[in-house]
């Protein structure tokens, strides 16, 4: 296996086009394990850990753009993710150990495409756009399409994820997850909610995204539809849990994990929604 170090974005894209069956390595927290366990067999590794262009967090008018090489720790230390974007900071703070948060990148979390990836539900709730670059040019893909349509929208062999962009939300972004332990926990189930309330405490905007419920992280459209326009009260939150449970019953019918996940989702969804007011 060949290992090549890229110093610029242009060089990284050139190397990707030059070597077939190549893989990108940035933080290495996932891909090194995959190679060691012989789950993947790349002919070349393109190291982008020195590409400074991918390590920026930028505020652009109504948007925030996160470079694919930004680490979880970078997000936690950025003042942009205070206030109504606290849910993204919380999701990043719950990833693995300090060592993993210092090395692991947001771009790697997306491209690795684990259903348990903590950073993805908040980015789905924010309706983020992924910026993919190759020698053929630039392509923009909605993150929900990237996960829900598989090969149609998924990253191509010669493409590099360079950035994640989303519009600054008016509502509050939250995140909650259930793992098997307090630290180093891989999510068994997670929820991110983006909710905006009017002066009468009525839901005027809502996005709900889940992780680890099924094979892919996804929007929970039925819960969104139920919550929209309702006064944000405890009984409404309770009913939204039932809506999500009924949706899970259809999606996970016959799966042995359904009874556990059906019970667990109540606490996770309630925690995510309760943080809207905090």
Predicted regions and their residues:
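C-terminal structural segment of proteins
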Residues: 1-278
């Amino acid at each position: 296996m060949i290992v090549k170090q890229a110093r610029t974005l242009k060089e990284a894209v050139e190397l990707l086009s030059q070597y077939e069956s190549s893989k990108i390595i940035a933080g290495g927290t996932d891909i090194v394990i995959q190679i060691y366990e012989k789950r993947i067999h790349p002919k070349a590794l393109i190291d982008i850990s020195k590409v400074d262009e991918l390590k920026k967090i930028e505020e652009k008018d109504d948007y925030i753009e996160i470079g694919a090489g930004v680490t979880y720790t970078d997000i936690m230390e950025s003042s942009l993710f205070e206030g109504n974007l606290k849910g993204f900071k919380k999701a990043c703070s719950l990833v693995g150990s300090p060592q993993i948060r210092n090395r692991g990148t947001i771009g790697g979390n997306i491209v690795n495409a684990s259903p348990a990836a903590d950073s993805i539900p908040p980015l789905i709730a924010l309706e983020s756009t992924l910026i993919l670059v190759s020698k053929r040019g630039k392509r923009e893909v909605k993150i929900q399409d990237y996960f829900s349509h598989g090969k149609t929208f998924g990253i191509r062999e010669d493409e590099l994820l360079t950035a994640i962009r989303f519009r600054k939300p008016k509502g509050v972004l939250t995140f909650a997850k259930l793992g098997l332990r307090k630290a180093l926990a891989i999510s068994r189930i997670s929820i991110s909610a983006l909710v905006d309330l009017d002066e009468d405490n009525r839901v005027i905007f809502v996005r709900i995204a889940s992780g680890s419920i099924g094979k892919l992280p996804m929007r929970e459209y039925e819960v969104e539809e139920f919550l929209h326009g309702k006064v944000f009260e405890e009984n409404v939150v309770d009913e939204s849990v039932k809506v999500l449970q009924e949706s899970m019953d259809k999606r996970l019918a016959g799966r042995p994990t359904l009874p556990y996940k059906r019970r667990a989702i109540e606490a996770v969804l309630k925690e995510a929604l309760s943080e809207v007011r905090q």
